[in-house]
């Protein structure tokens, strides 16, 4: 696909869980670490921007942020985070929250949402763009996929796609 759109116009992830607050992170591709401050200059969160704003940088990009400390999937764990996808309905493509084995991986940009082709992996995809070739439904949708496969209605799709209201607002 000859689209050079950013994975999303603007994304911030804020991690609040005690397990991850003290974790160290590997930032890859176009991703960067940033602080958000309130009107008084007080830092309100430690955040990550995965891709630059498409309207500021039309070349788009792909980025990933991975916890350097592996999670033992034999034990229960809780992750709590906020996602801001911006307010531009014309942006693309979305974001994936994924579990995979390497802290330096950056998957396919665009319709791969930074996790595409990473195998083995498990991803929750928040998709804001319809890619007809992937059997995407019309409108924003969420799905759970494995092994970096973002095509719907196959054996790697574990749940979804579920159409949801506007994810960008």
What is each residue range found by the language model?
Residues 1-22:
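Bacterial Sec-dependent N-terminal signal peptides
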